[in-house]
Each structure stands twice: as C-alpha cells, then as structure tokens.
C-alpha cells in the first residue's frame, strides 16, 4: 500500500470528533511507514485523522454511526453541492438552531447540516436525543470559516476509499494478509474513575471490548497487523493481553464537554507492528 499521489499532505480531517488521533499522527508520521502494508482498515473512523494524514491508497473505512458514514459518502459523491448548501447557512445563534431543526431526507442537505453543526456546536460533540435528533447547543463560533479547499481535497481522496456503515467486527471480511487495521475504539475512563465512557453516540461496553479482542485474534490469524488505542485500565490490559507490544502514553485530553472529563489521561497502544513513539 502506498500513499495517494493525488492529495496534498496538508489535507486534514473535516470534522471535529471526540477521541480524535491528531496527537498520535504527529508522533508517528515521520517514523511509521504505512506503505509497508497491503491495505488499510479503520472500523471506528470518526474524524479520520490517521486516514487523512497518511492517505493510504487501498483504504476501507467504516463506523456504526450511520449519519457520520452517510456524510462521508455524500462528501465523496457530491462535494460541490454540499459546499453550496453550507455557504447558504448563516452563522448566528438563530441560524444555528434553525439548521439544527431542519428535517430533510435530502442526502446533500443532511451532510451539509452534519458538517455545519459539527463545526459550530459546543466542542464539536456528537450527541443525539432519544428520537435521534442532534441536541448539542450553539458553540458561539460566529467568525468560524469553513475550509472548503480542504473539503474538496477530502472528497478527491475519498474517491478511492471503500466506505461502509457497519459493526466493527464486520470489517474482517476485507482484511487479508499484510493488511493494517487501526482500531480507535471508545475508551473506558482512567483506572481512577474505573468506569466506561460514553461519547459520540453509544456506550462501548465491556462486552464490546471483548468482541474487539476477538477481532484482533482474527486479524492476527489472517497474517495481518493491528494498532489499538485504548485506556490504561487494568481490565483493558487484561482483555487485550496478546503478548504483543504495549506502549504506555500519558497526555492531556478533553473528551466531550464536561470539565470532569478533562485532564491527564493514561492511555496505551497495543500493536503487533514495529510502531514506536
């Protein structure tokens, strides 16, 4: 797998997303050779920091968040129309709540709405109510300027990317020998708080963590490679004990919008690659 020759290296994620991995990209982009792998798979794509900075040619991305994935697909297929709709949205508080309340089946308007709310909401949180409606308040970003040039680059790159909405375990169908699977699943809290965390849309339970562990076993059985980012939590270390490389990391984080969840986080990278930090 090689880097895409079509896209400039300055392309970056077009969405803000809790748990994003820009910090990891900065640490490894100069030393980790993604081109050594035959394909790239990201079943928790979120904001796609790894995808957009490394820009692998043979890439498969997915997520269980259907609205997120439909936004990716529409950005790929109809970027000019998406940009035109975003340009028509205002920037005031009233404009924000008008857009938030829009109900439409038009895929272009839905994608434009998703991007608009993501960038102008409070902290870029993805949160929905019991009816599936986005309910994050205005973020007071009156002077925010959308980067339409970057959106166009993203669209061009996504032309060669397989995009699906599905459960993370189903990604195994496309994983073959010498593939790389990047697993950025939702985290537990730190070991001090000793609980499981909910951000974006759904709780990622201990049962889900066990399913993820089984997926890693299947990845390795196929002669492929994985990089898993997760919390430095005793139970997590037990679940993902594969006798592979475990790299501890301590860094500041601000998941979501609650001050109680901001501060120093202890994390781990689990991998059977030659990744070093």
Predicted ranges, named:
Residues 2-24, 30-34, 76-197, 211, ...:
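SAM-dependent nucleic-acid methyltransferase catalytic core
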Residues 45, 66, 170, 187, ...:
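Short, glycine/acidic-enriched loop or turn micro-motifs at the edges of active sites
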Residues 274-277:
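Flexible, glycine-/basic-rich loop-and-beta segments that form/coincide
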Residues 116, 269-272:
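Short, well-ordered beta-strand micro-motif
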Residues 31, 37-91:
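Conserved S-adenosyl-L-methionine
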Residues 178-269:
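Conserved acidic-Pro-Pro-aromatic motif
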Residues 51-56, 173-175, 236-242:
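Short loop/helix-cap segments at secondary-structure boundaries that form the rim of catalytic
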């Amino acid at each position: 797998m090689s880097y895409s020759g079509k896209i400039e290296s300055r392309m970056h994620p077009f969405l803000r997303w809790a748990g994003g991995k820009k910090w990891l990209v900065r640490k490894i982009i100069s030393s980790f050779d993604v081109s050594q792998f035959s394909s790239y798979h990201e079943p928790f794509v979120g904001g796609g920091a790894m995808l957009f900075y490394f820009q692998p040619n043979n890439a498969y991305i997915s997520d269980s968040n259907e609205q997120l994935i439909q936004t990716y697909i529409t950005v790929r297929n109809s970027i000019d129309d998406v940009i035109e709709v975003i340009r028509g949205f205002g920037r005031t508080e009233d404009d924000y709540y008008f857009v938030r309340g829009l109900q439409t089946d038009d895929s272009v308007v839905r994608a434009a709405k998703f991007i608009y709310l993501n960038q102008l909401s409070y902290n870029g949180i993805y949160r929905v109510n019991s009816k599936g409606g986005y309910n994050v308040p205005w973020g007071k970003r009156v002077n925010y300027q959308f980067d339409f040039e970057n959106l166009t680059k993203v669209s061009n790159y996504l032309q060669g990317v397989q995009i699906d909405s599905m459960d993370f375990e189903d990604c195994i169908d496309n994983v073959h020998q010498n593939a790389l699977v990047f697993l950025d699943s939702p985290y537990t809290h730190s070991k001090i708080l000793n609980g499981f965390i909910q951000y974006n849309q759904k709780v990622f339970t201990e049962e889900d963590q066990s399913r993820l562990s089984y997926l890693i076993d299947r990845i390795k059985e196929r002669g492929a490679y994985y990089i898993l980012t997760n919390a430095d939590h005793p139970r997590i270390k037990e679940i993902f004990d594969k006798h592979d490389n475990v790299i501890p990391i301590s860094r500041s984080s601000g998941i979501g919008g609650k001050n109680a969840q901001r501060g120093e986080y202890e994390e781990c990278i689990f991998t059977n690659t030659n990744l070093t930090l």
